Structures are given as structure tokens and as C-alpha cells.
Amino acid sequence: MKEIEKLKEEYPLLNKLIATEEVFWVNPNMEKYETAIKDSPLSEENVKDAEERLKRFASYIAKVFPETKETKGIIESPLLKIPSMKQALEKNYEQPILGELLLKCDSHLPISGSIKARGGIYEVLKHAEQLALQHGMLTEEDNYAILDSDTCREFFATYSIAVGSTGNLGLSIGIMSAKLGFNVTVHMSADAKQWKKDLLRSKGVNVIEYEADYSKAVEEGRRQADADPSCYFVDDENSHDLFLGYAVAASRLQKQLEELKIVVDEEHPLFVYLPCGVGGGPGGVAFGLKLLYKDNVHCFFAEPTHSPCMLIGLMTGLHDKIAVQDIGIDNVTDADGLAVGRPSGFVGKTMEPFLSGNYTVSDEELYRLLKELADTENIYLEPSALAGMIGPVKVCKEDAYLQKQQLMEKVQKGTHIVWGTGGSMVPEDVMNGYYKTGEALTILEK
């Protein structure tokens, strides 16, 4: 315990985090892009390689997931202006949001309805491609739609895939692996929602449930895979492939911004707010965006007050050597996708020089924001997906970051993108429950 007391002295913000109060933290270790990229374990080439692989698989995806036909097998989500929500935020928080506000609707990504459809599906496809190439089932010049055959499914059925998840990553890995023919096991933590487990089982996925939290589910998944040479483990805590699958989102977003005639340059900064669990999804997206927009994009991670694992890891520099439970935080939150007690050391160390900051948000606030977005824009997200929504308010209100980066004059001409990470697959009765909770909390507040 002495070490914790020492940490609290060194990082006074820890006291607020321990009290589960909402905090806003500016990253003192952020560097200029050109310096940061020199020490990065990943590069633009890695992201381009991932992008090319997804293009090779597009004909297969379009064939087996009819909902992707229109986009020719490219798994992408809309970018929407949300002016009514912007007005509501300004009114409710008595804070003008300088610049335009948009929502990136990964909540409505085809196949698995969350940001995890990016990294999760990509990693499974990469593994399938490697196996098929090794065994002469495929060449890179082939039309990958040939993988949709009994022969290929029977081949993949001799291999298995395992993953530990609080929910959404499990959905992506499970749905994609089962479609290819793999035997797939998803190790689900205690906070995983029942409907997610039911949906996976309906797709022929083996779901193993744990009483413990996310870290335990990952540990068990890793153990199972270690004992079986034909089993591939998707390691959410350390996976470069997941990270790169998420990073591909950046070039897609760039095209969408161009279509909307939104400029990003030194005079027109871009601010992006990303809900963060273990870190792979937001880390990958932020990394991809930094490669494209360099010092003109400012990325913030958003975490629940009861699971601020990445913030604690980054602030203390201990990364995955510290868990929220070590300092007396319970890691219990309704934002199930973000209910992670120990961050990814790989993501924390990779993103440390690129990340602008991090903030926390309470479950109550997430529910109120959920209701507000439904009322103003008729868009329904799951609670964890609303963590980014309060970001523009926090950045404009606590202007320490804007001052430090000399953005006070520029923010007005800038753009804020809130990353809506999941929600379209939530069953109607569950979503109605979320909405009612938001309604009750809004009445209470007033």
C-alpha cells in the first residue's frame, strides 16, 4: 500500500480517480508527430498492408454477408453531422462547442454492429488467409470469394480460434470465424451482456462464461490456445493485427471528410473522441489518424469513472503493470465494452507520444447522453458508445489543452468527431431499458 500512497503524492489526480470523480487529463508526454513516429513499432506500411488485405477479401465478404453488397464487401460506417445534439449539449452543459460536431457511426457497422468489426474481423481474415496460402487453397491473385465453399469450410474446421471478451470483440471474432468454418470459442467476462452470449451461441459459437472480469477471460482464452497447437488466440491485450485493422478506419474517414468538404490542416484542427477499454480499438484508430493528419489531429480517449485503466497506466507510466483494482477502484460499469481493469501495455506504450489526453465519464452521464442522442437525432447507441460524446464539451470547457497547443483561435474552424462504437445490434427491449434509465436520471438531475 505504501507504493500507492507514493503514487498519490506524485500524481494528485489519482485521488479524484479513486473517488470515481470525472477527470480530464492532458498528456504531458505527447510529442510532435515527426518525433513520435521515429520510435513507433508500427508504420504506415503496416496499415497499408492491412488495407490491401481487406480489399482482397472484399469479394468474399460481399458474397457471405449480403448486408455489405452495396459497399462491395468493404465494412464501413456513416459519418453524420449531429447539429441538434450539439445544441442540446451546449444547453445542458452551458458550454459552447466551438467548431462542427460529427458522429462516426461504427455502431452501425455491418456484420457485428460495433468498432470491433474492424479489428476483430481483420485479424480472423488475416489468419484464414495465412492458412489458406500455406496449404495451397488460395493464391493472392485469386478471387477470395472461392473461400465460400464446403472444401474451404471443412479445411478451416480442422482449426480453432479463441478470444477473451466483454462482448463486442467476441461478436466480431465469433461471427467471422464461424462463417469461415473455424471452431470458435469466446471466453466472456462477468459483465458481458446476455443477448451478446445468446447471439453468439445462435451462430454456432462456443461461449464460456466467467464470474471474473475481462482480464481473467483473456487469461483463460490464452491458456486454452496454448494447450492446443491448432488453436489461434486473438490477444486483445497485445495484438498488432487487431490494432492495424482499426487503423484502416483513418483513410476511410479521410474520404468521408473530403466528401463533406471538411478541411483538416493547421488552421482547421480535427478533434477525435474515442471510448477506451483495453485500448486496441481507440489506439488503432488514433494511430491511423495521426499517420494521415500528423499534428493537426488531436485524439482523446474516454473511459468510465469505474474503469479508467488506460488513464492510470499512461499517467503513472506503469501501463499494464497497474490495474484499477490495485488502487481500490471496482471496475464495475454498465459500459460493458469498457469494463477493463488493466490496460494493454502495447497500446499504452505505442500511443503515449501520440495521444492528446484522456478523460472519464460516469455511467449516469452515459445514460443521459444516450437518451439525449435518441431524442435529438433518433440515433440509438449502447451506453459505452456515448463516452466520446462529452469530449467536445470537456475540451472546450477545460481549455488547458487548447491553450497549450495554441488552438484557442483555431478551434472555431475545427471539427469534432465523436466515435460511436456500438449499438445497432442491441435488442429493442434492452435498448428501451437503457433509454428509460436515461430518462429517469435526466428527471432526477433536473
Curated annotation (Swiss-Prot):
GO biological process, one term: D-serine catabolic process
Keyword NADP: no
Catalytic activity annotation: D-serine = pyruvate + NH4(+)
Lyase recorded as keyword: yes
Cofactors that this protein relies on: pyridoxal 5'-phosphate
EC code(s) of this entry: 4.3.1.18
Domain of life of the native organism: Bacteria
EC main group: lyase
Annotated positions of the N6-(pyridoxal phosphate)lysine modification: K116
Keyword entries, A-Z: Lyase, Pyridoxal phosphate
SUPFAM superfamilies per record: Tryptophan synthase beta subunit-like PLP-dependent enzymes
Molecular function per GO: D-serine ammonia-lyase activity; hydro-lyase activity; pyridoxal phosphate binding
Membership in a protein family: Belongs to the serine/threonine dehydratase family. DsdA subfamily.
NCBIfam families xref list: D_Ser_am_lyase, PRK02991.1
Protein name in the entry: Probable D-serine dehydratase
